[in-house]
Amino acid sequence: MSRSVKKGPYIQEVLLKRINEMNKNGEKKVLKTWSRSSTVFPQMIGHTIAVHDGRKHVPVYITEDMVGHKLGEFVLTRTYRGHDDKSEKSSRLR
């Protein structure tokens, strides 16, 4: 379910403040955040934000297409190791 329109999009205040400071000073550095639920705003375009995935911070470069989505959508929380290959045991059961 999406957030109510009357409430507006959520963003962590500290994160928005740091982005606005960096835009004002013309800086480009990686910002660490644990706020996966923050919405990507147009002010963030061109910045790299390291989003926490539960173990480490994964750098995400923000582009125009990401505006309106949540930061957590761009970082996987589970390691996909692929499916098992066919083993002798599985082929024997047939």
UniProtKB/Swiss-Prot annotation:
One function term, GO molecular function aspect: structural constituent of ribosome
Keyword Transmembrane helix among UniProt keywords: no
A GO CC term assigned to this protein in UniProt: small ribosomal subunit
Stored NCBIfam families: rpsS_bact (TIGR01050)
Pfam families, A to Z: Ribosomal_S19 (PF00203)
Protein role: Protein S19 forms a complex with S13 that binds strongly to the 16S ribosomal RNA.
HAMAP family: Ribosomal_uS19 (MF_00531)
Protein name: Small ribosomal subunit protein uS19
InterPro entries: Ribosomal_uS19 (IPR002222), Ribosomal_uS19_bac-type (IPR005732), Ribosomal_uS19_CS (IPR020934), Ribosomal_uS19_SF (IPR023575)
Gene3D superfamilies: 30s Ribosomal Protein S19, Chain A
Keywords: Ribonucleoprotein, Ribosomal protein, RNA-binding, rRNA-binding
PANTHER family: RIBOSOMAL PROTEIN S19P FAMILY MEMBER, SMALL RIBOSOMAL SUBUNIT PROTEIN US19M
Record family assignment: Belongs to the universal ribosomal protein uS19 family.
